[in-house]
């Protein structure tokens, strides 16, 4: 039987804890129906016997205290409400235990913003990870030695797993159901909970808001210039001139501040503008393309699909109700 330890983090999202426990309970029930032994033993593990979660709205009582768990097979780090860095600091005392369990052979999985606490342990250094797309820039800034793949719904590498934004944790849980039981049971569980079992990409849900979580005012002004003039023919030399610095210095500072090249940033701004038009208007794909400054339909479609995870037409069909 797989011993599952759900961490009772301070400010944890209640649903992440409850849904995890409930899903494994349902899976055990399916197994018992077919005359098999339950596969998962689930416990809520905390540092204290009374934990405040969801911005102190609720109190939960862990089944067992951290110091009383010598070994577990799977550690679940739930998502946290509010500021991810503050939540990580609030729960930093879990980090040594998480690391020790991993070194003893346990798998460790983070949900949404829980990736910040997993990153804090140092276990993710040099490895892949995902989190909620809204935290992506902040995560990259504080953990540059981790390969963030924020377009992915889940990741799993060397016993370290993570899930993307909010409800992506359902796919993470199904991954463990399939791994420790069978594909057949994972499919049955997915149908029971009405989950798209093979959802792999959260790109269609990402909203690009600009990487402005930095202190370089000159680069912020350049970003604003791009966002106000994206429909025109922008080039790096032109934008550097508006900033009154050399192109080389501008490009270096831009990458340092935003984690994007200037060309990448321009593409992201253009595609975000296109997405908004496709969501709310009846304009054709070609009309939208011209409005954001593209002239080649194939190039536009390729760039759009690479960033949004689907074609412009598919994106419109997904979100537009006009």
Language model features with spans:
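Short active-site oxyanion
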Residues: 103-108, 123-128, 159
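Basic, amphipathic alpha-helical hairpins
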Residues: 178-182, 202, 221-235, 254, ...
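Conserved anion/nucleotide-ligand pocket segment
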Residues: 151-192
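A short, Lys/Arg-enriched amphipathic alpha-helix from helix-turn-helix/homeodomain DNA-binding modules
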Residues: 207-234, 241-243, 264-283
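Accessory alpha-helical/coil subdomains and C-terminal extensions
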Residues: 180-224
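A conserved active-site-flanking secondary-structure segment within enzyme catalytic domains
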Residues: 125-153
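Basic/polar phosphate-binding segments, predominantly the helix-turn-helix DNA-binding elements
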Residues: 225-227, 233-269, 289-314
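N-terminal functional module of multi-domain proteins
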Residues: 2-119
